[in-house]
A protein has these predicted regions:
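The conserved Walker
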Residues: 51
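Conserved helicase ATPase motor motifs in RecA-like P-loop NTPase domains
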Residues: 179-186
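Interdomain "pre-motor" coupling segment immediately N-terminal to P-loop NTPase/helicase cores
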Residues: 1-9
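Phosphate-binding P-loop
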Residues: 35-44
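SF2 helicase/translocase NTPase motor core
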Residues: 9-30, 35, 55-58, 64-175
Length: 186
């Protein structure tokens, strides 16, 4: 038993903890980027590889490592509508991370079950579409109040801002990033 506890402690302190066990074939640059970013106490980065070089895998590796080491217990992933289920499947299939998909219907059900509850406090790992939160001030406020450790934003290049105009989702992004310590933009 003592040997098992010693071995467990060694594994928990391993420099590759969170990078092993994922069902992925990594490219060398992905491991390097994931290791560099995950070693930061509170990562705030823009992952800007070329199309097809695995930004999603890099972000998932970082997320997995931060979650396993307890530095990102509450994670909010914002993605375009068309990618919600793809992210859900990839995170579960490749990293065995079980996220909850949030949309208006799910929020309504959670609020019906317990009046006055913030639905975003019901799950630790949440995926929702950027447009869902950007189109509802109530849901955006609830998400903001939920106290996340890490925000992951896919297709961040769609969040445009200039002195004369901004994309519809940019104010949401700006507000969330001001309050959430960790940030991964893809």
């Amino acid at each position: 038993r003592v040997e098992a506890l010693r071995r467990r402690a060694e594994l928990r302190q391993s420099p590759v903890r969170g990078f092993m066990g994922g069902r992925v074939d990594l490219l060398p640059h992905q491991m390097y980027i994931a290791s560099e970013v995950a070693s930061r106490l509170v990562p705030r980065v823009l992952l800007a590889d070329e199309v097809g070089l695995g930004k999603t895998i890099e972000a998932s590796l970082i997320l997995h490592r931060l979650h396993l080491t307890g530095r990102a217990e509450r994670v909010l992933v914002l993605v375009p509508d068309a990618l919600v289920h793809q992210w859900f499947v990839e995170l579960y299939r490749r990293f065995h991370l079980t996220f909850s998909i949030y949309d208006e219907e799910r929020c309504d059900v959670l609020e019906t079950e317990e009046e006055g509850v913030n639905p975003f406090l019901e799950s630790q790992l949440v995926i929702c579409s950027t447009s869902f939160l950007a189109s509802s001030a109530k849901r955006a406020e609830q998400a903001l109040a939920a106290g996340w450790d890490l925000l992951v934003v896919d297709e961040a290049h769609h969040l445009e801002w200039s002195s004369s105009s901004a994309s519809a989702a940019y104010p949401l992004f700006e507000t969330l990033t001001a309050k959430i310590p960790g940030l991964l933009q893809l």
